[in-house]
Amino acid sequence: MQKGNIGVTTENIFPIIKKFLYSDHEIFLRELVSNAVDATQKLNTLASISEFKGELGDLTVHVSLGKDTITISDRGIGLTAEEIDKYINQIAFSGANDFLEKYKNDANAIIGHFGLGFYSAFMVSKKVEIITKSYKEGAQAVKWTCDGSPEFTLEEVEKADRGTDIVLYIDDDCKEFLEESRISALLKKYCSFLPVPIAFGKKKEWKDGKQVETAEDNVINDTIPLWTKKPSELSDEDYKKFYRELYPMSDEPLFWIHLNVDYPFHLTGILYFPKVKSNIDLNKNKIQLYCNQVYVTDSVEGIVPDFLTLLHGVLDSPDIPLNVSRSYLQSDSNVKKISTYISKKVSDRLQSIFKNDRAQFEEKWNDLKIFINYGMLTQEDFYDKAQKFALFTDTDGKHYTFEEYQTLIKDNQTDKDKNLIYLYANNKDEQFAYIEAAKNKGYNVLLMDGQLDVAMVSMLEQKLEKSRFTRVDSDVVDNLIVKEDKKSDVLEASKQEALSAAFKSQLPKMEKVEFNVMIQALGENGSPVMITQSEYMRRMKEMANIQAGMSFYGEMPDMFNLVLNSDHKLVKEVLADEEKECSAAIAPIQTELEDVTKRRDALKKKQEGKKDEDIPTAEKDELNDLDKKWDELKQQKDSIFAGYAGKNKVVRQLIDLALLQNNMLKGEALNNFVKRSIELI
């Protein structure tokens, strides 16, 4: 028996391995099974070039549980005593830091032939045994034993067949790995597509009302997964079946892309476009990354462009660099090339479907839209390609490319400054009246109700030349597209003041909501009262919800305009009645107000151009008193108008009708509206 120390100068390398090199203890099984598969594949390679002339026989890798042990057995190339010394014992580095650095620079040489991958066994084991026999003729079987210290023993043993058994004596704090269900789940996670059969126990069947083991191995993996096959060999049903195996709880995918490239990097895989739910983040991390059919991670940021992390599927590449635990990706030029390649393949596939089967593309647009919009917002190259097949959808459900839509609206939706105005709604039901008003003017209205449409609107205004997006409820219909300079309002100032004060006094008090009353001549057939919301302020608040650094806008109140149509019969009647009821009380106040205004204006004119110290104190005091008096008289007038409005049910009824149309009338206010409606009828 040979005894010795593993060739490291640090007292004990294993705590370093546990702490720094592996993020998840569970990957020990992946590493050891992968090593067994590598050893088996090497034997196959040697046999194919006639360097091994014996019988290959059954090459299944077996994983088995004992009372306190896990054993991984293969019938691969095995190891000689010299090879154990080379690959296991002689990790001859000057210290732990150099050890880590050396590994980082030489990962591929070590992983896959025992080496560091093997040492992951000590994360869960108090003792590890290697019982191995080389395929070489006349080779002597040996047994290597180590308890996690730098000391080991190596002795000759009897072993009938070539290959390697690794026996792990599981630590007391890792007993979970002795449970059949735990090992079964890990094998399913990491080893489902390894290229050599992996058996865990025996298949079971129901007999006499209970499950019993059969003599047949329970092989847990598909050795020739779909992505390793040629697309020409596969049917649509094959792709759908594989998707169901990967994601049994998901709806059928929209379509898929089969990747297969050998130069300048190796990459195979299948990416599926899923039906996306409403929450973007819930659907990330669904692409599984493999390295030569060994599962690595489902965190593919950096390999897959960010907008495509919403996709499902598998990618397999030996050219993606991994750290020691194979759980995180390193920055690398190959990765950037792969990311660019995937983005191009996706845009080419979308372009192909659009070109060859536009009806199918339009049918699936609502599901595709989030991927395409996300890509256009985050990747300039993708935007350049996607603008040819990205679609607008109008409120009638018709689809247009960007170019088609520009042609459609150019004649009727260009304003006086030659800007093309894109009208849109984000809720067909709530904005129905506004949509209908726009359509009655001959305008087309887009439906932009997607999760990313707020950001898309802002981006498209920058990308599309002389183009502006305006929501249909941001102004009265005549002001949405201003084609010529407007005439001034027909109502004189005193009448506007009376109407405005009356309606303003009856507006409801709502948390974080402010109203501004406006009066416009909108024609006898226009609505008597409407509520609009400034496009700019609303958009800033919407962007604040999705973009960091704009929380200031999110804290501001919602600003709405209550627009009175001075041409409408009901508004005219309210104004006439108000003048009749209030004129006697208003007249003396108005006379005094005019006198105050006249004197105040005269004083201000007199003080124009003078420095503050040159203005007599008496004049300053008088002007201050006049300002206070003016405010007081104005409040008296507003109070009289408010008193009138409070008794006039039509004023509140018109306001509530506008609120109702805008989905802003609820609870007690809605109940009061219903009662008042009955009384008025």
Swiss-Prot record:
Protein name: Chaperone protein htpG
Chain segments carrying region C: 546-681
Superkingdom field: Bacteria
Major localization class: cytoplasm
GO molecular function: ATP binding; ATP hydrolysis activity; ATP-dependent protein folding chaperone; unfolded protein binding
PANTHER family per the UniProt record, alphabetical: HEAT SHOCK PROTEIN 90 FAMILY MEMBER (PTHR11528)
Family (UniProt): Belongs to the heat shock protein 90 family.
Keyword annotations from UniProtKB, A to Z: ATP-binding, Chaperone, Cytoplasm, Nucleotide-binding, Stress response
Organism of origin: Bacteroides fragilis (strain 638R)
Protein purpose: Molecular chaperone. Has ATPase activity.
B: annotated span: 327-545
Residue ranges, annotated region (Disordered): 601-620
